[in-house]
């Protein structure tokens, strides 16, 4: 899977909307590190979860 995110992108996790808006911090292969406003830093496997850019 090609990851179409860049550091600074604002995203939401559609399966965890209560996490709030997140900002992409880094991308390493398929792992996207996002700092969400309600739960802090999470590492997302982009092969399993498609984040939605806002």
PLM regions and their residue ranges:
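Basic/aromatic-rich interaction segments and small domains that mediate binding to polyanionic partners
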Residues: 2-54
């Amino acid at each position: 899977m090609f990851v179409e995110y860049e550091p600074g992108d604002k995203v939401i996790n559609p399966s965890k909307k209560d996490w709030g808006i997140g900002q992409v911090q880094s991308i390493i292969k398929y792992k996207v590190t996002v700092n969400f406003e309600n739960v802090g830093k999470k590492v997302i496997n982009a092969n399993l979860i498609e984040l939605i850019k806002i």
